[in-house]
C-alpha cells in the first residue's frame, strides 16, 4: 500500500515564491502589445514543474494566472488559464524522458519540451482564447504570434536551462530534510 504524499512547507514556500516571481515577470516587467505579450514569466512555471512535479507546476500556473487577472483587472479566460497550467505540467511530464541523461541530453530535452509546450500553450490555447473570448481576428494576429513564438521559445529555453543547471536546483530539490507539519492531539 502506498503512503499518501502531502506537500510540505518547503514545497509550498517555493511554489509561492515562483508564483510571485511569475506575477512580477508577467504583470510588471512586461511588454504588453494587445494580442502580444513579451515576458519571461512562464520560466517560473516551467521550473516549478521541473523542480516540484507536474501537479505543483500546474497549480503554480493556475494560481499565477488567476491572481494576475485580478491584478490587471481582466476576466479569467479559460483558454489562457489552461495554457498557463500547461506551462507547468508538460515540461514536468517530459522530465522522465531526459532525467537520466547527461547535461547535453537534459538541455535538449528541456528545450524540446519548451518548444512543444509553447506550440500547445501559446500558439493554440492562448490564440484560441484571444480569438474566441476577446474577438481578435485569427488571420490578423497569427503572424505576430508566430514571431513571438520564434523569439520567446529560445529565450525561455535558455533561461530555464541556465536556472535548472544552477546550484539553485540542488537547493530546491536537494536532500535537505524539509520541515514537516504534524498534527498534534491535545
Q: Can you name each region flagged by the protein language model?
A:
Residues 1-186:
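Loop-helix junctions at membrane interfaces
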Amino acid at each position: 500500500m502506498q503512503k499518501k504524499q502531502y506537500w510540505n512547507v518547503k514545497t509550498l514556500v517555493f511554489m509561492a515564491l515562483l508564483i510571485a516571481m511569475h506575477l512580477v515577470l508577467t504583470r510588471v516587467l512586461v511588454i504588453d502589445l494587445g494580442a502580444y505579450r513579451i515576458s519571461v514569466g512562464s520560466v517560473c512555471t516551467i521550473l516549478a514543474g521541473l523542480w516540484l512535479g507536474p501537479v505543483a507546476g500546474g497549480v503554480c500556473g493556475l494560481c499565477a494566472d488567476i491572481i494576475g487577472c485580478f491584478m490587471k483587472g481582466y476576466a479569467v479566460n479559460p483558454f489562457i488559464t489552461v495554457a498557463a497550467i500547461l506551462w507547468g505540467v508538460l515540461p514536468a511530464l517530459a522530465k522522465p524522458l531526459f532525467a537520466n541523461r547527461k547535461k547535453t541530453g537534459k538541455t535538449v530535452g528541456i528545450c524540446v519540451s519548451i518548444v512543444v509546450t509553447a506550440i500547445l500553450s501559446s500558439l493554440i490555447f492562448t490564440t484560441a482564447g484571444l480569438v474566441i473570448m476577446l474577438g481578435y481576428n485569427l488571420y490578423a494576429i497569427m503572424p505576430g504570434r508566430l514571431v513571438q513564438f520564434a523569439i520567446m521559445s529560445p529565450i525561455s529555453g535558455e533561461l530555464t536551462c541556465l536556472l535548472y543547471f544552477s546550484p539553485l536546483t540542488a537547493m530546491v530539490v536537494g536532500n535537505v530534510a524539509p520541515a514537516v507539519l504534524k498534527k498534534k492531539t491535545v
